A protein has these predicted regions:
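Generic beta-strand/beta-sheet core signal
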Residues: 241, 265, 285, 309-311, ...
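Short, basic, glycine/proline-bearing loop/turn elements
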Residues: 78-82, 235-239, 283-285, 339-350, ...
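Glycine-rich phosphate/pyrophosphate-binding loops
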Residues: 109, 268-269, 276-286, 364-391
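N-terminal donor/sugar-recognition subdomains of glycan-related enzymes
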Residues: 1-237, 244-261, 270-274, 281, ...
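Active-site/ligand-binding-proximal alpha/beta "capping" segment
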Residues: 316-375, 379
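Phosphate-binding loop/pocket of nucleotide- and phosphate-handling active sites
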Residues: 386-433
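Extended, hydrophobic alpha-helical segments in both membrane/secreted and soluble proteins
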Residues: 262-268, 308, 357-360, 376
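Long alpha-helical, hydrophobic tracts
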Residues: 252, 260, 342, 346, ...
Length: 646
């Protein structure tokens, strides 16, 4: 296909405006195309003929364009984001973007020759420059691309109304690609919802267990102490998880245990103890009571020299079991808003991911390991259907029937293997992080599980190869002992924590006292709505009051971080559901009235939930501050407690 100098100039203008650098480079490399341009009498009648099979992009350009426009202006007029598979001639996008409600149109294209041709014919520079038109090459999409799209505004906020539209029948030939793309987008939206928090009760449990665990955190060695004494003492970390493949790796792990730092999951700790393999670190992340039971053992001298790294929101039973057998444990936090509100920064924070293997991986990075080896990281069922090794405390088939089975690519990439959606989520999050580690750090990540699911980005090697090639000398074990702060420093932090928790109880009360007044005002206004001429003005006043209230809640992110942790998941779920009402397109005055009524009702229910959750947090803080009070009394700090309360 030969283009005029003017058309080439237009192509360059479009390319310059394109934000997607990879696509920009790929388009520049194209010199010719299998597509033939077919122009009709109408300026909008632009079709392409695929000369490889003599098929056309559209059967009837104008009819299909009008049909699409009618549908979108009727059903999807208020949708902030639209998704299309196939660029087509691009005219539909230019027409739809005349509607200011459409903030973004995301277009996925597999055959970028189509874009190459159309960039010579039509000017998309304005739409591309503003990113209202976003074009993605499905052949080049990475894990990170899906993650960034599905977790950012406004794409995440409107994820519950996501659907993928086919540009024309021509694109049905790419049905495998379409199904794969659709699946990945749906999965990534789901992951983003989990990441933002999908259960306020989980958040509440985290807050109450964190407050309950505060005295133990403050009176034991800190994460800062761990980093200062242990950073760089070893090059290679072995992360021991509890997949079915672990059993076959244990003899080799025992043989080479002295030559690597061993991080083990809480669930693999009793298994290693049984086989006489001493880990250097045992990590615990989950907040459940059943997880705490992995520490309900008396292994005697075996525990000497083991450092237990515990997330600050674990179940108190876990810490009670530990205190009976060792004082060598460190309690560390993530960057949760309530935890940051307390400003106990000395005890440290790090992002721990969603699984204990994830937590161990991050920890090994912070301790400057150059090689990270995963074993037992199956994230899939064994051939016999077992979810865990035979020695697993809760039985080898503990998760065998818990979830629906899903097929995923197996270790080695030659077959499929059964997994479930939770393991898949762990796998995807691990893959995202491995991608960043390999890209930005001088660290190699090896998957030596020799079974289970493939973890993209890791280097798959037999465990024996890793031991023989990466482990050459004994380490000086046990590593240097960690010490807690002086008693005076501990007392200072105990009082500081007590003060902040007391203030948070006060914040809950003050917030709810004001909030109930606003709620009552809005509810009374709503109840007095009558079918009168003033309804429209009255409704707008109520909606303005609602908007003010939501703004005040949003401001808590900056003003009162202690309240936002429990409200965050509630807000997320509410906004995701509200999107479905937001995009309803009323055709009549009655439709508009009904939409407004529904909008107000939803917000009143939301306000009731906000009040209830803040009240629940207040009660949880009052109950779980008791261990802190007992520790302060034990240390004869009663009079300081009184001062704090006043």
């Amino acid at each position: 296909m030969i283009f005029t100098p003017t058309q080439k100039e237009l192509f360059n203008k479009n390319i310059e405006a394109l934000g997607n650098i990879l696509l920009k480079e790929s388009l520049k490399e194209i010199k010719s195309s299998k597509f033939e341009l077919i122009l009709g009498k109408d300026n909008l009648d632009i079709n392409l003929k695929d000369t490889s099979d003599n098929t056309f992009l559209y059967e009837n350009v104008i009819d299909e364009l009008n049909s699409m426009l009618n549908t979108y202006n009727d059903k999807y007029l208020l949708y902030p984001v639209l998704y299309f598979y196939g660029f087509g001639n691009g005219i539909l996008f230019k027409a739809l973007l005349q509607n200011k409600n459409h903030q973004h149109i995301v277009v996925f294209e597999k055959d970028i020759e189509i874009i190459w041709v159309m960039f010579h014919i039509l000017d998309f520079s304005s739409e591309l420059q503003s990113a209202r038109l976003m074009v993605l090459n499905t052949n080049k999409l990475e894990i990170q691309d899906y993650n960034e799209l599905c977790s950012s505004k406004p794409f995440f906020q409107f994820s519950r109304i996501y659907f993928l539209e086919l540009m024309s029948h021509y694109y049905e030939r790419f049905h495998e690609d379409i199904l794969g793309l659709n699946k990945k987008l749906a999965e990534n939206f789901k992951n983003s919802i989990v990441f933002h928090g999908n259960d306020p009760l989980d958040a509440l449990q985290g807050i109450e267990q964190f407050v309950y665990n505060l005295p133990q955190m403050i009176t034991h060695p800190s994460y800062k102490e761990l980093l200062s004494k242990r950073k760089g003492v070893s090059d290679t970390a072995i992360i021991v998880s509890t997949g079915p493949s672990l059993t076959k790796q244990l003899p080799l792990l025992k043989k080479y245990a002295s030559k690597a730092t061993i991080f083990c999951a809480d669930s693999s700790y009793p298994i290693l103890a049984k086989h006489g393999i001493k880990p250097d670190y045992v990590c615990m992340l989950e907040r459940t009571e059943i997880t705490a039971e992995f520490f309900n053992h008396d292994f005697g001298e075996f525990d000497n020299g083991i450092c237990f790294i515990i997330k600050s929101i674990v179940h108190p039973n876990a810490i009670n079991y530990l205190t009976k057998k060792t004082d060598n444990f460190t309690i560390v936090s993530t960057y949760a808003s309530f935890i940051q509100y307390l400003k106990l920064d000395y005890f440290g924070y790090f992002n721990m991911g969603f699984s204990v293997a994830h937590m161990a991986c991050y920890l090994s990075l912070h301790l400057n390991h150059k090689n990270i080896i995963f074993i037992g990281q199956d994230l899939a069922y064994a051939e016999n259907g077992n979810s865990h090794p035979d020695d697993y405390q809760n039985s080898a088939n503990y998760e065998s029937q818990m979830y629906e089975h899903i097929l995923t690519e197996a270790y080695g990439g030659k077959e499929k293997i059964k997994t479930h959606h939770v393991w898949l989520m762990f796998k995807r999050n691990l893959e995202q992080d491995v991608q960043k580690i390999q890209k930005y750090l001088d660290t190699k990540v090896y998957n030596c599980t020799e079974g289970g699911a493939r973890i993209e980005g890791t280097i798959e090697k037999p465990f024996l190869w890793a031991c023989e090639n990466l482990l050459d000398k004994d380490l000086n074990k046990p590593f240097e002992k960690l010490e807690p702060l002086s008693l005076n420093k501990q007392n200072e932090f105990l009082l500081k924590a007590y003060y902040k928790v007391c203030k948070s109880i006060e914040h809950c009360r003050d917030f709810n006292d004001n909030f109930i007044k606003v709620y009552d005002k809005i509810k009374n206004s709503f109840m007095s709505l009558q079918n009168s001429q003033k309804n429209e003005i009255f409704i707008q006043e109520i909606i303005q009051d609602i908007d003010k209230t939501k703004t005040q809640i949003d401001e808590l992110y900056n003003t009162q971080k202690d309240l936002i942790q429990i409200l965050g998941p509630l807000l997320t779920q509410f906004e995701l559901n509200l999107a479905r009402i937001y995009v309803l397109n009323p055709k009549t005055k009655e439709d508009a009235f009904n939409k407004s009524i529904l909008w107000i009702k939803e917000h009143l229910e939301f306000m009731e939930l906000v009040y209830g959750h803040i009240k629940a947090q207040e009660n949880a803080l009052i109950k779980n501050i008791l261990p802190l009070e007992e520790k302060l009394k034990e240390r004869k700090l009663d009079k300081w407690m009184e001062r704090v309360r006043k």
